């Protein structure tokens, strides 16, 4: 009986370990990385400007280096400071603006957000959701990011004048949130002139 109990406990521990490893592997696959196409576009832009505008070429390469450094080193951690993930977002948007001057963006914060610990690269999928659809647009467009901490919740919204109808792109984001947070909400609000994605996360105490 004791031997049987030991086997049962060992089996339970192995099953639990395998489940955790599977979830970790799935989380790593869902973690968004800077797309290779974006990197190729930036390198192509830097090459074109190397002769006519060396200063901007240098600026592009510096910003690109910051993105890659964060992606290679900091994003491997389980949690990072919100301020670090926000800097990554700002660098990404600044680079995108160098590539496409039609982009206008703003980022606002309310409440004690800077010292929150969040999973790395949590917010970049929302930006990319609109950025890559904007390639077909030949006029100015905007992306507004807003963060607010209130009553134990992180409230985030990403609004854009880009009309995006492929809501299936949110599936990977939703699955990652399911694995990371016990309580969350995610919705897309589509208007005549603006699309907005709202996300609410219950912060661990």
Give residue spans per PLM region.
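Two-component histidine phosphotransfer core
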Residues: 1-188, 196
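Short C-terminal beta-strand
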Residues: 195-205
């Amino acid at each position: 009986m004791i031997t049987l109990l030991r086997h049962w406990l060992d089996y339970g521990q192995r099953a639990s370990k395998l489940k955790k490893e599977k979830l970790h592997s799935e989380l790593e696959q869902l973690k968004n990385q800077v797309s290779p196409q974006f990197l190729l576009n930036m390198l192509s832009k830097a090459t074109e400007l190397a002769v006519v505008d060396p200063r901007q070429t240098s600026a592009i390469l510096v910003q690109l280096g910051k993105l890659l450094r964060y992606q290679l080193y900091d994003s491997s951690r389980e949690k990072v400071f919100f301020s670090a993930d926000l800097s990554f977002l700002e660098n990404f948007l600044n680079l995108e603006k160098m590539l496409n001057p039609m982009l206008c963006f703003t980022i606002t914060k309310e409440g004690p957000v800077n010292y929150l610990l969040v999973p790395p690269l949590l917010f970049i999928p929302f930006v990319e959701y609109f950025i890559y659809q904007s390639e077909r647009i030949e006029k100015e467009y905007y992306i507004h990011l807003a963060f607010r901490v209130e009553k134990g919740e992180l409230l985030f919204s990403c609004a854009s004048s880009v009309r995006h109808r492929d809501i299936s792109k949110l599936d990977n984001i939703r699955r990652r949130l399911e694995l990371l947070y016990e309580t969350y909400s995610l919705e897309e609000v589509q208007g005549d002139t603006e699309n907005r994605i709202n996300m609410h996360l219950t912060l661990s105490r």
